[in-house]
Regions:
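Cytosolic regulatory regions of ion transport systems
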Residues: 1-215
Length: 215
């Protein structure tokens, strides 16, 4: 269980709070808007109405006691930037800030953010890949070059074993697991036989995955 500070209780911040709550973490939420604070109360341990660009207010929260600080302020990049910088000055262990544009990501990293999330860009990329290829069921970006795809078993692979296909040698792709009837099996061996009711969880470089699965 981690102690988390969430600054910005808008839609994205509220979803973060919900997920953190489900994972069993202790969450303190901060926002300038009382209505947004009330909306997030069911998912947090504590909440305060306050201005995160005020150093004294942030200091009163005991920033050094939090394992992670999320900055999910919407509508004011200036406030997000100032808050990010102040958090690091006050000894924050890890600051994760939200960006809405590429240039914002660069400024946030320069001003103290340890990591930057860009939900609109990440969702756009996921949707573009997911819904333009009928045989792609899910997609997780690892970094700019690597991803995990959940993909339908190609027709030519049906009835063959993982070892027989040897996609690691041919494409540099690792089969992490397979899914059948909604159940995931990560105990994949070279003897695992692929069937037409199976999807594959494959890890590799984008170019290799695109070539292998004709994405």
């Amino acid at each position: 269980m981690k102690n988390v500070l969430l600054i910005g209780a808008g839609r994205f911040g509220r979803h973060i709070a919900m997920q953190l709550s489900q994972l069993g973490h202790q969450v303190m939420a901060v926002d300038t808007n009382e209505e947004r604070i009330n909306d997030v109360l069911p998912f947090v341990t504590n909440a305060q109405i306050g201005d995160s660009t005020n150093a004294e207010f942030l200091r009163s929260l005991g920033i050094g006691n939090f394992d992670v600080c999320f900055v999910t302020i919407s509508g004011s990049f200036q406030n997000s930037l100032e808050t990010t910088s102040l958090l690091k000055e006050l000894g924050a262990k890890c600051v994760v800030s939200r960006a809405e544009r590429d240039v914002q990501e660069k400024f946030l990293l320069r001003n103290g953010a340890d990591n930057v999330v860009y939900p609109e860009k990440q969702m756009a990329k996921w949707a573009a890949i997911r819904f333009t290829a009928d045989h792609i069921f899910d997609y997780i970006e690892i970094d700019e070059q690597h991803a995990i795809f959940e993909v339908q078993v190609p027709e030519a692979w049906i009835g063959k074993s993982v070892g027989e296909l040897n996609v690691r040698r041919k494409f540099g792709i690792t089969i992490l697991g397979i899914k059948r009837a909604g159940k995931t099996d990560v105990a994949v061996t070279p003897d695992t036989i692929l069937s037409d009711d199976t999807t594959i969880l494959a890890l590799g470089e984008y170019k290799a995955l695109q070539k292998c699965f004709r994405i």
